[in-house]
């Protein structure tokens, strides 16, 4: 079968690889779409050392069940089901798994399967979930990033009447904007230097969109909140300047969530006195724990189709990665079939 294989640092190629075989508890899936995660190009370039070549890339997937192992019978899955899945499998017995922190499972590295930018993938039944009726394959492959956004919102203390600022309007920022509004935020300000991304966020319901390249984000934010600062600030761009600016936007007793991958050597200047005097809460978001059931229930509430900027066939995956790095698109999909 064809697959997008990360061969070595900065080398991604479409290659012929053996078609995977399903074990007793596995589900074999014909992959329809994989969404490029913002972290994927950084992994290939070697600037995010969370995985190592050779490896099939991709983890945000939708597809169709084509085979079930003889013991894959606990979820009622059947051949022909439209599915998505969690790219990692949890052991269920380590301290993290038993404490609701499955995303830090001690066996993640052992259970991390091959990627989904391929014609077929085999995942353990535990990882596979049926898509809700009415959710397309194109929307369904965004389930994993939606689950991580749900984790971010859970940590962000957004509540009825909150003021929220979101910096960075890629797929994550656009989904977070919708979740903030669903969570009861009264006013949402967003920021991104790309005009089309700002326009889409306004269509999603944001109250104000700011271009941080030409406007003073702090001054605009203070005017927006009556000089109080925001109850919640979520930094989702990964830009170093945005990470610094976000700290100044948070109001007293507010929550700041860093929801992006930053360079490993980037040090954020922060005064502990400000944490004390303003009673701030600062959090990071890594991955989502067991949130897929909640996520799937929420998919019909979200506007996901407008987030898909472009679709590339699997044979053009290298071009798609270059497009992703240009930072002009929101979500780019790889079509595995046809």
Task: Label the model's feature ranges.
Residues 20-34, 47-95, 132-134:
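Glycine-rich beta-strand-centered segment in the early N-terminal region that forms part
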Residues 203, 240-301, 336-338:
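Glycine-rich phosphate-binding loop and adjacent beta-alpha segment
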Residues 216-226:
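Short amphipathic alpha-helix with an adjacent loop that forms part of the alpha/beta core around
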């Amino acid at each position: 079968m064809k697959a997008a294989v990360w061969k070595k640092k900065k080398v991604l190629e479409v290659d012929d690889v053996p078609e995977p075989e399903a074990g007793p508890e596995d589900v074999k899936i014909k992959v329809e779409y994989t969404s490029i995660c913002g972290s994927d190009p950084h992994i290939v370039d070697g600037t995010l050392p969370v995985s190592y070549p050779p490896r099939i890339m991709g983890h945000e997937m939708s597809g169709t069940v084509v085979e079930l192992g003889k013991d894959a019978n606990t979820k009622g899955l059947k051949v022909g089901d439209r599915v998505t899945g969690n790219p990692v499998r949890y052991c269920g017995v380590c301290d993290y798994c038993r404490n609701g922190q499955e995303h830090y499972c001690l066996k993640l590295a052992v259970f991390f399967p091959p990627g989904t930018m391929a014609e077929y993938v085999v995942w353990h039944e535990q990882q596979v979930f049926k898509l809700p009726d009415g959710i397309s394959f194109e929307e369904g492959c965004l389930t994993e990033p939606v689950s991580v956004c749900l984790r971010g919102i859970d940590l962000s203390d957004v509540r009825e009447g909150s003021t929220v600022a979101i910096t960075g309007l890629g797929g994550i920022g656009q989904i977070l904007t919708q979740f903030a509004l669903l969570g009861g935020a009264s006013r949402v300000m967003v920021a991104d230097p790309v005009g089309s991304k700002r326009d889409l966020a306004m269509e999603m319901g944001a109250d104000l969109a700011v271009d941080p390249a030409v406007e003073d984000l702090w001054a605009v934010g203070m005017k927006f909140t009556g000089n109080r600062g925001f109850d919640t600030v979520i930094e989702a761009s990964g830009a170093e300047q945005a990470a610094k600016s976000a700290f100044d936007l948070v109001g007293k007793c507010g929550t700041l969530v860093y929801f992006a991958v930053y360079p490993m050597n980037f040090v954020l200047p922060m005064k502990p006195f400000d944490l004390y005097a303003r009673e701030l809460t600062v959090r990071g978001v890594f991955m989502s724990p067991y949130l897929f059931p909640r996520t799937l229930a929420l998919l019909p509430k979200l506007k996901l189709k407008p987030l898909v900027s472009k679709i590339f066939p699997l044979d053009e995956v290298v071009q798609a990665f270059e497009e992703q790095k240009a930072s002009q698109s929101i979500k780019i999909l790889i079509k595995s079939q046809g």
